[in-house]
From Swiss-Prot:
GO terms for molecular function: phosphate ion binding. It comes from Prochlorococcus marinus (strain MIT 9313). The chain crosses the membrane at residues 30-50. This is Photosystem II reaction center protein H. One of the components of the core complex of photosystem II (PSII), required for its stability and/or assembly. PSII is a light-driven water:plastoquinone oxidoreductase that uses light energy to abstract electrons from H(2)O, generating O(2) and a proton gradient subsequently used for ATP formation. It consists of a core antenna complex that captures photons, and an electron transfer chain that converts photonic excitation into a charge separation. It is found in: Cellular thylakoid membrane. GO terms for biological process: photosynthesis; protein stabilization.
Length: 62
């Protein structure tokens, strides 16, 4: 028997949730867009640290 989790309950509460079906509407698209945007910011920050274009005063990389 499947266990109920907080994440599962959150996804079930979103509008347009129907397992195995494609329903009209946005569904979980805003959640996916938010996660993608946060990943983009994270990767740009890592790239700036690698290229030393992000100034970090108290951290030295040797």
């Amino acid at each position: 028997m499947a266990q109920s989790t907080r994440l599962g309950n959150l996804i079930k509460s979103l509008p347009g949730y129907a397992p195995g079906k494609v329903v009209p509407g946005w569904g979980t698209t805003p959640v996916m867009a938010g996660i993608g945007f946060m990943l983009l910011i994270f990767l740009v920050t890592i790239l700036q640290i690698y290229n030393q274009s992000l100034l970090l005063q108290s951290i030295s990389f040797e």
